Amino acid sequence: RDLPAVFRELSQHVIHGFPGVNTLFNAMLHHPDFNKVDWSHLRLCVGGGMAVQGATARMWVEKTGCPICEGYGLTEASPVVTCNPVTSHEFTGAIGVPVSGTRVKLTDENGQEILTAGTRGEIVVKGPQVMAGYWQRPDETAQAMTADGYLKTGDIGSMDERGYFSLLDRKKDLIIVSGFNVYPAEVEDVVSSMPQVLECVAIGVPDADSGEIVKVFVVRKPGMVVTEEHIHAHCRNRLTSYKRPHVIEFRETLPQSTMGKFLRRVLREQETGCPDASVTRHT
């Protein structure tokens, strides 16, 4: 993306509202032109499209004075399903409560509704913003919808005692290590909290003993030094052993979609084509 052009445009206006995705917020915060924009009038900042990382949210409010209000939606249920109150004064990491006229619930692997607070399950949605179906693809539509008209989002989430939902990860991105579920976003949130890390993506890679292990791709901040050992030490006190990255690869950039979402699929495909499946274990 052409960030200098973005900042030139923003600097010519009084900014009251600003929507974006985590990668955009993060890239802007670390760009030298960020302070050329007058953020003092910013009243509403909405994050969506992907999980907003805690480190990015904290830095954003420190520099602009306006917290990121996170919401949740998807192409099949556009534009929004849940959102935090816009009057909120802090970033919570939750995706909020269902918007008006929308029903949201969690289901287990058998499609049964989960009623216990804090239990993880697939987010299913019913409301006026939910699609009627995929155009001329009845089989795929049938797979995506429940018998009572809920859309199966493929996203894993949880709900707290207040009725606030949290987005954990995509069901298809789940990493299974020795039978234990690992959500990439949890690993990424820990690694990205390191001041030397600009961006990171976690995926599962095949392992003969565990089925899968966690691999993290890391982009360093310009001029900063961070090694594998630094990251292992940081994660050792913050993640259970099976959630810790066992393989770390440093890169200059990470593949992104035109919307700024990281393309895990591309990274997984690159790993599948790698002839060297051996790894060094760290505990």
For the regions a language model picked out, list residue spans one by one.
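Short hydrophobic/charged patches on amphipathic alpha-helices used for structural packing
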Residues: 3-7, 26, 34, 142, ...
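Core-facing hydrophobic residues within beta-strands of well-ordered domains
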Residues: 39-42, 99-102, 197, 245
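Active-site glycine-centered loops adjacent to acidic/histidine catalytic or metal-binding residues
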Residues: 49, 73, 96, 155, ...
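Beta-strand->loop->alpha-helix junctions that form or flank phosphate-binding loops
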Residues: 69-76, 96-98, 203-206, 249
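Conserved ATP/PPi-binding loop(s) of AMP-dependent carboxylate-activating enzymes
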Residues: 97-101, 112-144, 182
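Acidic/polar alpha-helix N-cap and adjacent early helical turns
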Residues: 269-283
